[in-house]
Amino acid sequence: MTAEMDIQNSIRLELSRHGHYVFRANVGKVRMPNGRIFDTGLPKGFPDLFGFRGSDGKAFFIEVKNEIGKLRKEQEHFQQAMQITPAICGVARSAAEAVRIVEEG
């Protein structure tokens, strides 16, 4: 079984090779050395990768899952909410699938 981080890295490289701009979303909370909690501020369910197509600037959001990974409820809600926007949104389990989502979306 492939680690999601490995799939994510291969997707980032392949989308960049295809001329797209892609960023990794770091989500979560961290306790700082001073004891305060730092929250990234992204909403629950925000996808692992986001960016825009190099050809037309259209935004995309990609949730990365391995072969057996399933969406959490928050991730399902984000995917559903994006359906009414002009942005591209999908779930990818490989670099080829991510390229297809972005370029055919």
Regions found by a protein language model. Name each.
Residues 1-105:
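Catalytic phosphate/metal-binding cores of nucleic-acid and nucleotide-processing enzymes, i.e., regions
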